[in-house]
């Protein structure tokens, strides 16, 4: 019985997501220029990004992508998660 309760508690905690970090409206507007809010994958990706990264981390990742063409793995994971969820 204890094992079952422990497993249930762990499962419940794993389902919890962190609250979104604060991002300025201009960051979302910039994101939506390339990924429209009318697309459910884009909206999901934005939600995942704001939970996984601070605005400062996100901006650094965008700057790095523009400068070096390298995508931050957290952005890739967020988008992949949303694409897979849409087609699941």
What are these regions (language model features)?
Residues 12-15:
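C-terminal motif of bacterial Sec signal peptides marking the signal peptidase cleavage site
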